[in-house]
A protein has these predicted regions:
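Acidic, glycine-enriched catalytic cores built around paired aspartates
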Residues: 1-232
Length: 232
């Protein structure tokens, strides 16, 4: 949009970011960034490779810093990379200005190695294929991938078989590292947020752990609600 198609000038993009996409012109640019710029999680090699490149820089940099076990035996010695942000993506996003993908300031970043919410538009297979391109053999601190489907989707036996085949393909053919699911509808989560007394037993998968939905901060609740609901 900026350097190839030249639909947006660098100055226009920078001003829109500083404006946090609040003015009418900034909102026009934000809409283009969200809808017209390709995103990670859709099995687009050119885009996914950018994520791989950033991960490789991160991994190589981490190797430069010995830990307290350095020189004390074969186990340990260096620090290692991981993508398990748990729910820190919410707090980290709160301290991050607007970004050139159209994300507004102070909103959550993408969690773990998951695509940004609602940006993975080509279904779960495309997400798995994008994630499989990451150098997971080097990310020994964990590779966190969150996915969400609705109970209605899994109420059909054929869909249960589809998701079983999808998961097997991810791990057996694409050499996947990790995936975890929430099986709950957006409507249920919104109702639980509005009427917590009616959903005291609602448990959700946050990241590397599960928790009662009602005990989570509203920001973390909103982040879980915003996750893409996948279809098959």
């Amino acid at each position: 949009l900026v350097f190839e198609e030249r639909k947006i000038t660098p100055e226009e993009l920078w001003n829109a970011i500083l404006d946090d996409y609040t003015s009418k012109e900034s909102q026009r640019i934000q809409e283009m960034l969200i809808n017209d710029a390709p995103k990670y999680g859709n099995d687009i090699d050119e885009v996914d490779q950018l994520v791989v490149d950033v991960y490789n820089i991160y991994i190589d940099e981490m190797k430069k810093y010995p830990n307290t076990r350095y020189g004390r035996g074969p186990i340990g010695g260096i620090r290692y990379a991981g993508t398990s942000s748990i729910s820190a993506n919410v707090g980290q996003g709160y301290g991050t200005m607007a970004t050139p993908d159209g994300r507004k300031a102070h909103t959550p970043l993408a969690e773990g190695c998951s695509p940004a919410h609602a940006m993975d538009k080509k279904g779960p297979t495309a997400v798995f294929k994008s994630v499989s391109k990451l150098p997971t053999h080097e990310i020994t601190g964990g590779v966190l991938l969150n996915q969400k489907v609705t109970p209605q989707l899994l109420s059909k036996e054929e869909n249960k078989e589809k998701i079983e085949m999808l998961i097997k393909t991810f791990f057996n053919r694409l050499k996947g590292y990790h995936v975890q699911y929430n099986v709950v509808s957006k409507e249920t989560l919104l109702d639980a947020q509005a009427h917590p007394e009616k959903h005291k037993d609602l448990i959700v998968r946050v990241a590397g752990y599960s928790a009662f939905f009602n005990v989570l901060s509203k920001a973390t609740q909103d982040d879980i609600i915003g996750r893409t609901e996948q279809t098959l």
